[in-house]
A protein has these predicted regions:
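Glycine-rich helix-loop-beta junction characteristic of Rossmann-like nucleotide cofactor-binding loops
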Residues: 36-42, 105-106, 144-145
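S-adenosyl-L-methionine
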Residues: 74-121
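Class I SAM-dependent methyltransferase Rossmann-like catalytic core
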Residues: 1-43
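Short glycine-dipeptide loop
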Residues: 67-68, 145-151
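Conserved SAM-binding loop of SAM-dependent methyltransferases across substrates and taxa
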Residues: 54-67
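A short glycine-rich, Lys/Arg-flanked "PGG" loop and its adjoining helix->strand segment in the class I
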Residues: 132-148
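Class I S-adenosyl-L-methionine
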Residues: 159-203
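Conserved class I S-adenosyl-L-methionine
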Residues: 43-53
Length: 203
């Protein structure tokens, strides 16, 4: 991270807003805006947050789900404890981690959210492909754990493989949308793919 990047971040509206409102990251506002648009999370929902650290999306999940909700947060890195959140350190690409989550939530989840991002190499084609790979892991997990009617949201770096991934989402959800929330930086290639009302795949 360069000095210029740090200086630009300090000037960023959502970065300053997150600091002032005691949120762990500016990404908090992306999920707030996505939920406002698509009504992803309902009170009492069981929510799984993939790539959760440092916890900004988990904070929003707890807020929107309320005291009756359950939030399970997964990341390969550590995350400071958070009231109302069960944290699991692991990799969604690891079958043992996936099985552990499924065993922890035998009743299934209402919502799966993912703000996972690959390590950026600077080669956009490579980074896009790695982003799609993470999206596919998130979707595969969502299809294992979501209840009928459940919702899904995943970050994706937009590129030539994006339409194919959106079609995969369309096969398992009544609605699929691609959304660029206002809190995403204007120059960013990131978008969020939202799947609403999960169903088992049909022929």
């Amino acid at each position: 991270m360069t000095k210029r990047w740090r200086a630009d971040r300090r000037k960023d509206h959502y970065y300053k807003k997150a600091k002032a409102e005691n949120y762990r990251s500016r990404a908090t506002y992306k999920l707030k805006q996505i939920d406002y648009r698509f009504d992803l999370i309902q009170p009492g929902d069981i929510i799984v947050d993939l790539g959760a650290s440092p916890g900004g999306w988990s904070q929003v999940a707890v807020e929107l789900g309320g005291p009756e909700s359950k939030v399970f947060s997964l990341d390969i890195d550590r995350m400071p404890p958070m009231e109302g959140v069960t944290f699991i350190r692991g990799d969604i690409k690891d079958d043992v981690t996936v099985r552990r989550l499924l065993d922890m939530i035998p009743e299934g989840a209402n919502v799966v959210i993912s703000d996972m991002s690959p390590d950026i190499s600077g080669n956009y084609s490579y980074d896009h492909a790695k982003s799609i790979e993470l999206c596919e892991y998130a979707l595969a997990f969502a299809k294992k754990i979501l209840r009928d009617g459940g919702n899904f949201c995943v970050k994706m770096f937009y590129g030539d493989m994006s339409k194919g991934f959106v079609k995969m989402v369309e096969r398992s959800f009544e609605e699929a949308h691609v959304h660029h929330p206002k809190a995403s930086r204007p120059a960013s290639s990131e978008v969020y793919v939202v799947g609403l009302e999960f169903f088992s795949e049909r022929d």
